Amino acid sequence: MKFYRDHTWPSTLEEAIVIQEKLRDQVITEDQLEEPIQYVAGVDMGFEADGTISRAAVAVLSFPDLQVIETSLAHRPTTFPYVPGFLSFREIPAVLDALEKIQTTPNIILCDGQGIAHPRRLGIASHLGLLIDMPTIGVAKSRLVGKYEELAETKGSSQPLIYNGETVGVVLRSRTGVKPLYISSGHRISLPTAIDYVLRCTPKYRLPETTRIADKLASAK
Protein backbone atom coordinates (compact mmCIF):
# COMPACT_ATOMS: atom_id res chain seq x y z
CA MET A 1 0.00 0.00 0.00
CA LYS A 2 1.44 3.34 -1.06
CA PHE A 3 0.77 6.73 0.49
CA TYR A 4 2.54 10.04 0.91
CA ARG A 5 4.44 9.96 4.18
CA ASP A 6 5.20 13.51 5.30
CA HIS A 7 4.99 14.34 8.98
CA THR A 8 7.12 15.91 11.66
CA TRP A 9 7.31 13.73 14.76
CA PRO A 10 7.65 15.68 18.02
CA SER A 11 10.22 15.15 20.74
CA THR A 12 8.23 16.83 23.53
CA LEU A 13 4.60 16.93 24.70
CA GLU A 14 4.48 20.64 23.96
CA GLU A 15 5.38 19.99 20.33
CA ALA A 16 2.83 17.17 20.18
CA ILE A 17 0.05 19.43 21.44
CA VAL A 18 0.86 22.00 18.76
CA ILE A 19 0.62 19.31 16.07
CA GLN A 20 -2.69 17.98 17.43
CA GLU A 21 -4.25 21.43 17.61
CA LYS A 22 -3.06 22.18 14.07
CA LEU A 23 -4.43 18.96 12.59
CA ARG A 24 -7.72 18.68 14.49
CA ASP A 25 -9.59 21.09 12.22
CA GLN A 26 -8.61 19.06 9.16
CA VAL A 27 -10.47 15.96 10.35
CA ILE A 28 -13.54 15.14 8.24
CA THR A 29 -16.46 13.52 10.06
CA GLU A 30 -18.67 13.07 7.01
CA ASP A 31 -18.77 10.04 4.74
CA GLN A 32 -16.15 10.08 2.00
CA LEU A 33 -16.02 6.37 1.23
CA GLU A 34 -14.98 4.67 -1.99
CA GLU A 35 -17.82 2.25 -2.54
CA PRO A 36 -18.48 -0.60 -2.84
CA ILE A 37 -16.67 -1.51 0.37
CA GLN A 38 -14.65 -4.63 -0.47
CA TYR A 39 -11.88 -4.63 2.13
CA VAL A 40 -11.69 -3.56 5.76
CA ALA A 41 -8.54 -3.52 7.87
CA GLY A 42 -7.61 -3.49 11.52
CA VAL A 43 -4.46 -2.08 13.08
CA ASP A 44 -3.10 -2.77 16.55
CA MET A 45 0.13 -2.44 18.50
CA GLY A 46 2.35 -4.49 20.73
CA PHE A 47 5.71 -3.75 22.32
CA GLU A 48 8.87 -5.72 22.95
CA ALA A 49 12.00 -5.31 25.04
CA ASP A 50 10.32 -3.35 27.86
CA GLY A 51 8.58 -1.06 25.38
CA THR A 52 11.70 -0.03 23.48
CA ILE A 53 10.57 -1.82 20.30
CA SER A 54 7.17 -1.11 18.72
CA ARG A 55 5.38 -3.93 16.91
CA ALA A 56 2.53 -2.90 14.59
CA ALA A 57 0.11 -5.35 13.00
CA VAL A 58 -2.31 -4.89 10.11
CA ALA A 59 -5.00 -7.37 9.09
CA VAL A 60 -6.95 -6.90 5.85
CA LEU A 61 -10.26 -8.74 5.57
CA SER A 62 -12.76 -9.10 2.75
CA PHE A 63 -16.13 -7.44 3.30
CA PRO A 64 -18.81 -8.41 4.12
CA ASP A 65 -17.69 -12.03 4.62
CA LEU A 66 -14.69 -11.06 6.81
CA GLN A 67 -12.15 -13.53 5.46
CA VAL A 68 -8.48 -12.76 6.06
CA ILE A 69 -6.89 -11.56 2.82
CA GLU A 70 -3.53 -10.32 4.06
CA THR A 71 -1.60 -9.49 7.21
CA SER A 72 1.62 -7.63 7.92
CA LEU A 73 3.87 -6.96 10.89
CA ALA A 74 6.45 -4.22 11.35
CA HIS A 75 9.01 -3.48 14.06
CA ARG A 76 10.84 -0.28 14.83
CA PRO A 77 12.44 1.44 17.85
CA THR A 78 9.94 3.26 20.08
CA THR A 79 10.77 6.96 20.08
CA PHE A 80 7.94 8.56 22.10
CA PRO A 81 6.92 7.84 25.71
CA TYR A 82 3.64 6.30 26.82
CA VAL A 83 1.36 9.23 27.66
CA PRO A 84 -2.46 8.92 27.42
CA GLY A 85 -3.78 11.31 24.79
CA PHE A 86 -0.54 11.15 22.80
CA LEU A 87 -0.39 7.49 21.82
CA SER A 88 -0.53 8.25 18.10
CA PHE A 89 2.96 9.73 18.25
CA ARG A 90 4.22 6.54 19.87
CA GLU A 91 2.38 4.10 17.63
CA ILE A 92 1.79 5.54 14.15
CA PRO A 93 5.39 5.35 12.85
CA ALA A 94 5.33 1.55 13.14
CA VAL A 95 1.74 1.39 11.85
CA LEU A 96 2.81 3.23 8.70
CA ASP A 97 5.61 0.71 8.21
CA ALA A 98 3.11 -2.15 8.48
CA LEU A 99 0.66 -0.50 6.08
CA GLU A 100 3.39 -0.02 3.49
CA LYS A 101 3.92 -3.79 3.45
CA ILE A 102 0.39 -4.75 2.42
CA GLN A 103 -0.61 -5.14 -1.22
CA THR A 104 -4.38 -4.84 -0.72
CA THR A 105 -5.66 -1.32 -0.09
CA PRO A 106 -8.57 -1.37 2.39
CA ASN A 107 -11.60 0.88 2.02
CA ILE A 108 -11.89 1.44 5.79
CA ILE A 109 -9.38 1.01 8.62
CA LEU A 110 -10.56 0.23 12.16
CA CYS A 111 -8.04 1.35 14.77
CA ASP A 112 -7.57 0.08 18.30
CA GLY A 113 -7.98 3.48 19.95
CA GLN A 114 -9.83 6.75 19.78
CA GLY A 115 -10.90 8.89 16.86
CA ILE A 116 -12.28 12.31 17.76
CA ALA A 117 -13.26 11.09 21.27
CA HIS A 118 -10.07 12.70 22.49
CA PRO A 119 -9.18 15.82 24.52
CA ARG A 120 -7.99 17.57 21.34
CA ARG A 121 -10.18 15.57 18.91
CA LEU A 122 -7.17 13.81 17.41
CA GLY A 123 -6.83 10.25 18.63
CA ILE A 124 -4.84 7.67 16.70
CA ALA A 125 -7.67 6.89 14.26
CA SER A 126 -8.09 10.54 13.28
CA HIS A 127 -4.34 11.16 13.17
CA LEU A 128 -3.70 8.09 11.01
CA GLY A 129 -6.63 8.84 8.72
CA LEU A 130 -5.31 12.33 8.07
CA LEU A 131 -1.79 11.12 7.35
CA ILE A 132 -2.85 8.51 4.78
CA ASP A 133 -6.08 10.26 3.66
CA MET A 134 -8.28 7.23 4.24
CA PRO A 135 -11.53 6.53 6.13
CA THR A 136 -10.75 5.40 9.67
CA ILE A 137 -12.79 4.44 12.74
CA GLY A 138 -11.76 4.64 16.38
CA VAL A 139 -12.65 1.42 18.22
CA ALA A 140 -11.46 1.78 21.81
CA LYS A 141 -11.80 -0.71 24.65
CA SER A 142 -11.77 2.04 27.28
CA ARG A 143 -13.00 5.61 27.61
CA LEU A 144 -10.59 8.52 27.36
CA VAL A 145 -13.04 11.44 27.61
CA GLY A 146 -16.75 12.06 27.96
CA LYS A 147 -19.78 10.90 29.90
CA TYR A 148 -22.65 8.63 28.96
CA GLU A 149 -25.81 7.04 30.32
CA GLU A 150 -26.07 3.36 31.09
CA LEU A 151 -26.93 1.23 28.09
CA ALA A 152 -28.87 -2.00 27.67
CA GLU A 153 -27.09 -5.36 27.74
CA THR A 154 -28.18 -6.44 24.26
CA LYS A 155 -25.95 -6.29 21.19
CA GLY A 156 -26.37 -3.06 19.25
CA SER A 157 -27.42 -0.99 22.28
CA SER A 158 -25.67 2.37 22.45
CA GLN A 159 -25.53 5.70 24.21
CA PRO A 160 -23.99 8.98 23.03
CA LEU A 161 -20.57 9.82 24.42
CA ILE A 162 -20.71 13.49 25.41
CA TYR A 163 -17.64 15.67 25.93
CA ASN A 164 -17.81 19.42 26.49
CA GLY A 165 -21.46 19.40 25.44
CA GLU A 166 -20.77 17.67 22.13
CA THR A 167 -21.35 14.12 20.94
CA VAL A 168 -17.86 12.82 20.13
CA GLY A 169 -18.78 9.15 19.81
CA VAL A 170 -20.98 6.38 21.11
CA VAL A 171 -20.68 3.69 23.73
CA LEU A 172 -21.69 0.55 21.83
CA ARG A 173 -22.55 -2.94 23.04
CA SER A 174 -20.98 -5.07 20.31
CA ARG A 175 -21.99 -8.36 21.94
CA THR A 176 -24.77 -9.13 24.41
CA GLY A 177 -23.60 -9.15 28.01
CA VAL A 178 -20.03 -7.96 27.45
CA LYS A 179 -18.30 -4.65 28.15
CA PRO A 180 -19.07 -1.98 25.55
CA LEU A 181 -16.72 -0.41 23.01
CA TYR A 182 -16.12 3.30 22.54
CA ILE A 183 -16.67 4.19 18.91
CA SER A 184 -15.82 7.49 17.26
CA SER A 185 -15.24 8.86 13.79
CA GLY A 186 -11.61 8.81 12.80
CA HIS A 187 -11.48 10.54 9.43
CA ARG A 188 -13.71 10.64 6.32
CA ILE A 189 -16.54 8.73 7.98
CA SER A 190 -19.64 9.76 9.91
CA LEU A 191 -20.52 8.38 13.31
CA PRO A 192 -23.66 6.50 12.13
CA THR A 193 -21.65 4.86 9.35
CA ALA A 194 -18.84 4.02 11.76
CA ILE A 195 -21.33 2.30 14.09
CA ASP A 196 -22.81 0.35 11.18
CA TYR A 197 -19.46 -1.02 10.04
CA VAL A 198 -18.31 -1.86 13.55
CA LEU A 199 -21.46 -3.92 14.11
CA ARG A 200 -21.11 -5.61 10.72
CA CYS A 201 -17.54 -6.53 11.61
CA THR A 202 -18.49 -8.07 14.98
CA PRO A 203 -20.47 -11.22 14.13
CA LYS A 204 -19.29 -13.22 17.14
CA TYR A 205 -16.85 -11.51 19.50
CA ARG A 206 -16.65 -8.22 21.39
CA LEU A 207 -13.98 -6.81 19.08
CA PRO A 208 -14.44 -6.38 15.33
CA GLU A 209 -12.77 -9.21 13.41
CA THR A 210 -10.36 -6.68 11.92
CA THR A 211 -8.91 -5.46 15.20
CA ARG A 212 -9.29 -8.86 16.90
CA ILE A 213 -7.01 -10.49 14.34
CA ALA A 214 -4.59 -7.54 14.35
CA ASP A 215 -4.52 -7.71 18.16
CA LYS A 216 -3.52 -11.39 18.03
CA LEU A 217 -0.71 -10.61 15.61
CA ALA A 218 0.52 -7.63 17.60
CA SER A 219 0.41 -9.54 20.89
CA ALA A 220 2.22 -12.66 19.66
CA LYS A 221 5.53 -13.39 21.31
From Swiss-Prot:
Organism: Nostoc punctiforme (strain ATCC 29133 / PCC 73102)
Binding of Mg(2+), residues: D44, D112
Signal peptide: none
Cross-referenced InterPro entries: Endonuclease-V (IPR007581)
Molecular function GO labels: deoxyribonuclease V activity; magnesium ion binding; RNA endonuclease activity, producing 5'-phosphomonoesters; single-stranded RNA binding
Subcellular location: Cytoplasm
Annotated site residue numbers, Interaction with target DNA: Y82
Major place of residence: cytoplasm
Domain of life the protein comes from: Bacteria
Listed name of the protein: Endonuclease V
Reactions catalysed, as given in the entry: Endonucleolytic cleavage at apurinic or apyrimidinic sites to products with a 5'-phosphate
Cofactor(s) this protein cannot do without: Mg(2+)
GO cellular component: cytoplasm
GO biological process: DNA repair
Keywords, alphabetical: Cytoplasm, DNA damage, DNA repair, Endonuclease, Hydrolase, Magnesium, Metal-binding, Nuclease
Function: DNA repair enzyme involved in the repair of deaminated bases. Selectively cleaves double-stranded DNA at the second phosphodiester bond 3' to a deoxyinosine leaving behind the intact lesion on the nicked DNA.
Pfam families: Endonuclease_5 (PF04493)
Main EC class the enzyme belongs to: hydrolase
Enzyme Commission no: 3.1.21.7
Family of this protein: Belongs to the endonuclease V family.
